[in-house]
Swiss-Prot record:
GO molecular function: DNA binding; DNA-binding transcription factor activity; zinc ion binding
Record's subcellular location: Nucleus
Assigned keywords, A-Z: DNA-binding, Metal-binding, Nucleus, Repeat, Transcription, Transcription regulation, Zinc, Zinc-finger
One Pfam family named in its UniProt record: zf-C2H2
One cellular component (GO) term of this entry: nucleus
Keyword Cytoplasm in record: no
Family, per entry: Belongs to the krueppel C2H2-type zinc-finger protein family.
Keyword Zinc found: yes
Zinc finger (C2H2-type): 64-83, 89-111
Species assigned in the record: Homo sapiens (Human)
Name of the protein in question: Putative zinc finger protein 818
UniProt xrefs under InterPro entries: Znf_C2H2_sf, Znf_C2H2_type
Biological role: May be involved in transcriptional regulation.
Length: 136
């Protein structure tokens, strides 16, 4: 049932939305490679390709500002901070703020002199940074 719904949503013959053009070209090459396989009928390949295209669209997150396509929602959240200017991680030592926790942890080396902060220290620093950023 789901298979039938996915293939009816978009057929390979329909023009694709602009952001999928390069994806469609790559999938067309994949389709030609599948055509060479004797065990797979042409209609099966088209169904497979349309499922891949629909899966690509459904599984990816699209930012509403710049149109960048990202593979995971967490990446989308981090990327959107570029547009909003939100910096959730604030250093309690110097007040410098960061959009990503990993960059904040790397910054802490400036204050601690440690090359590899231990795991408990990292968790404590992230908590402090988030708390200071939220109470700002």
């Amino acid at each position: 049932m789901l298979e039938r719904n996915l293939t009816s949503m978009m057929s390979v013959e329909e023009p694709l939305p602009r952001p999928l053009t390069s994806l469609y070209i790559r999938l067309s090459i994949l389709e030609r490679n599948h055509m060479n396989m004797t065990y797979m009928a042409k209609s099966s390949v088209k169904i497979h390709i349309s499922k891949v295209i629909i899966g690509f669209v459904l599984k990816r997150s699209l930012t509403n500002v710049c149109g960048k396509v990202l593979s995971q929602n967490s990446h989308l959240v981090n990327h959107q901070r570029i547009h909003t200017g939100e910096k959730s991680y604030r250093c309690h030592e110097c007040g410098k703020a960061f959009t990503q926790g990993s960059r904040f942890i790397n910054h802490q080396i400036v204050h601690t002199g440690e090359n590899f902060p231990n795991v408990l220290n990292v968790a404590r620093l992230l908590r402090m940074a988030l708390n200071s950023g939220l109470t700002k």
